[in-house]
């Protein structure tokens, strides 16, 4: 990308806008929360050099997280739009501000976003609405494993769990809801100064050097391969269709389950390290999670899944070539199964 007079004008526009918000702060001592998000973007308009394609994918990723299926089978906004770290409110605001300098959010993106949700109604009532009929909108303090009835039955009766190498999820054949490079995470460093100077490569403040793309230096952080088991932290009614599931196991005591799982793995790998808990979702354009390992960090496009995972780190010689099962014993004392009629 080459710097231009048009980009100069945009940079001036953002500086002037930031100055107006700053003047309001000086006069009143505060701003409404949404204006703080706007002020934040005016100070650092990190999407200013991004391509329309980059912005479009970012828009669809946030849209995918800001809608849900209700127990009645209706599409509704997520109630946790402003999550505990305030990710999606600012993200949405910054996108609409940048699109505002480009003529507004393209209508095709609105249409594509609607299509993503309409797929749940392709066969009539969404599978998750039928599967969780009679359940409340949400269930707190549980983890939920989605899958085929025969596998969920084995998990309930025998505690049969399938452990998967992280490399498995890179397969192109997997659905978008499942496919991810689990041992890699990207961070996008704005490169305004380098682009304005006419450079096509630049270094980050941490010393990483790379090509400039979409106005960013895109750095990939990697970790060694590992094995994992995943579940969700709610009875989200989108999940059954996303994972082609006709059944689910609702585990009411995640800590007890994790303890049994760890004991089972220790029999296989006595000295193996294990990490258990909820996934932290991150924005590649933010560096809040820059120093965290990829194993419990995922791109915000997956945040609606509210994933809980158990990761274990066998040595290279112990690393399995493919997924395998272990049995933990019956889980009927800490879990219940729901399934579509057979």
Placement of each model-derived feature along the sequence:
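NAD-dependent ADP-ribosyltransferases
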Residues: 1-342
């Amino acid at each position: 990308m080459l710097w231009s007079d048009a980009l100069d004008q945009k940079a001036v526009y953002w500086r002037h806008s930031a100055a107006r918000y700053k003047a309001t702060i000086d006069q009143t001592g505060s701003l409404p929360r949404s204006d703080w998000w706007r002020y934040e973007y005016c100070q650092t308009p990190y999407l200013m050099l991004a391509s329309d394609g980059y912005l479009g994918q970012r828009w669809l990723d946030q849209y995918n997280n800001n809608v849900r299926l209700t127990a009645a089978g209706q599409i509704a906004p997520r109630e946790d739009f402003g999550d505990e770290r305030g990710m999606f409110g600012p993200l949405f605001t910054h996108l609409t501000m940048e699109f505002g300098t480009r003529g507004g959010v393209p209508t095709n993106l609105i249409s594509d976003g609607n299509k993503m949700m309409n797929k749940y109604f392709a066969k009539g009532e969404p599978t998750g609405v039928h599967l969780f009929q009679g359940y409340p909108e949400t269930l707190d303090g549980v983890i939920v494993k989605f899958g085929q009835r025969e596998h969920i039955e084995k998990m309930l009766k025998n505690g049969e769990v399938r452990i998967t190498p992280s490399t498995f999820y890179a397969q192109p054949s997997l659905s978008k809801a499942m496919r991810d490079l689990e041992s890699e995470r990207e961070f996008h460093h704005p490169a305004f100064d380098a682009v304005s100077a006419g450079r096509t490569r630049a270094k980050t403040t941490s010393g990483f050097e790379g090509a400039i793309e979409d106005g960013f230096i895109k750095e990939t952080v990697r970790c060694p391969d590992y094995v994992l088991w995943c579940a969700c932290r709610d009875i989200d009614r989108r999940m059954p269709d996303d994972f082609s599931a006709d059944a689910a196991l609702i585990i009411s005591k995640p800590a007890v389950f994790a303890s049994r799982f760890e004991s089972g793995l220790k029999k296989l790998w006595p000295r193996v390290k294990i990490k258990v808990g909820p996934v932290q979702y991150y924005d590649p354009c933010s560096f809040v999670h820059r120093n965290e390992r990829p194993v419990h960090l995922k791109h915000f496009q997956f945040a609606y899944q509210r994933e809980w995972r158990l990761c274990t780190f066998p040595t290279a010689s112990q690393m399995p070539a493919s997924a395998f099962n272990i049995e933990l014993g019956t889980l009927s004392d800490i879990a219940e199964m729901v399934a579509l009629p057979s």
